[in-house]
Amino acid sequence: MKKIEAIIKPFKLDEVKEALHEVGIKGITVTEAKGFGRQKGHTELYRGAEYVVDFLPKVKIEVVMEDSLVERAIEAIQQAAHTGRIGDGKIFVTPVEEVVRIRTGEKGGDAI
């Protein structure tokens, strides 16, 4: 099993969610996040003063899946989240040793 964490632009969430559903992903966890990468943020004007906004709004998606779905899920996220502009995001893939469904006690792939 693997866990995919994707940091994307907030307005791309619906497209990514739909793309993941189409490849067979049944559930995701979404967290609002703030961060910056190479784009370093931007400046804004407020009441005549200039402010540097370091952290940009992002959305973090977390999905755990069987190894057989990983490549298709990565491709789906890439295609759905892509704008071609700086700040499109990142995808991280890590191994998952165990999953346990709290309600039933199911483990492994049955618990996903």
Curated annotation (Swiss-Prot):
GO biological processes: nitrogen fixation; regulation of nitrogen utilization
Name the SUPFAM superfamilies for this protein: GlnB-like
**Where in this protein does the record say O-UMP-tyrosine is found?**
51
**What InterPro entries does the entry give?**
N-reg_PII, N-reg_PII-like_a/b, N-reg_PII/ATP_PRibTrfase_C, N-reg_PII_CS, N-reg_PII_urydylation_site
- Gene3D superfamilies per the record? 3.30.70.120
Q: Which PROSITE patterns match?
A: PII_GLNB_CTER, PII_GLNB_DOM, PII_GLNB_UMP
The UniProt entry's GO CC annotations, sorted and at most eight, read: cytosol
Cite the entry's keywords alphabetically. Answer: Nitrogen fixation, Nucleotide-binding, Phosphoprotein, Transcription, Transcription regulation
One example of the protein's molecular function in GO is: ATP binding
Superkingdom, taxonomy of origin: Bacteria
Q: Which PANTHER family match?
A: NITROGEN REGULATORY PROTEIN P-II, NITROGEN REGULATORY PROTEIN P-II HOMOLOG
Q: How does it assemble?
A: Homotrimer.
Q: Which family does it belong to?
A: Belongs to the P(II) protein family.
* UniProt function note: In nitrogen-limiting conditions, when the ratio of Gln to 2-ketoglutarate decreases, P-II is uridylylated to P-II-UMP. P-II-UMP allows the deadenylation of glutamine synthetase (GS), thus activating the enzyme. Conversely, in nitrogen excess P-II is deuridylated and promotes the adenylation of GS. P-II indirectly controls the transcription of the GS gene (glnA). P-II prevents NR-II-catalyzed conversion of NR-I to NR-I-phosphate, the transcriptional activator of glnA. When P-II is uridylylated to P-II-UMP, these events are reversed.
- Name this protein carries in UniProt: Nitrogen regulatory protein P-II
Instruction: Give the organism, scientific name.
Output: Azospirillum brasilense
Q: Could you read off the lineage of the organism from its UniProt record?
A: Bacteria, Pseudomonadati, Pseudomonadota, Alphaproteobacteria, Rhodospirillales
